[in-house]
Amino acid sequence: VFDKSEDAIAYIKAQNTFPTVIKAEGLALGKGVIIAENLEDAIAGVHEIMDDKVFGDAGNRVVIEEFLTGPEVSVLAFTDGKTIKPMVSAQDHKRAYDHDKGPNTGGMGTFSPSRVYTANDDLARICDRLIFEPTIDAMRREGRPFKGVLYFGLMITKNGPKVIEYNS
């Protein structure tokens, strides 16, 4: 997480791994992500978010993340702060153009349940055991128990499910 564009750019240069993901840390209506294919695009992306404020105050800080490939799956879950009960999965289509191309939008369409999530009987159990329950447990241990509906944005990679974002 970076507060200054020059620090974010220095980190990107040191990593020298592309594509790389640059996210506005704040809420940007599902649009605060830039996937940079090269250093030039990454530098421009950091400046757009942090200096030009294309996402407003959401871009006061940026998160630089590893680029993951695979289908995205959304899971909403009810929690009382101790137990968690996932609802049915969904799959969004966020990109503006066909074939997952173009800038992210607030959402071009969604279907439920996600075929990716339901096609593998073990995936829901893996997410429960390795993502959902540990998230609730960690929040409680940190003195921030959460009660309500929690959103898990997941990427199903060749190495298993990875969390790309949480929302409440």
Model-derived regions, located:
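A conserved helix-loop-beta module that forms one wall/lid of the active-site cleft
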Residues: 1-32
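Internal nucleotide-binding/catalytic subdomain
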Residues: 32-168
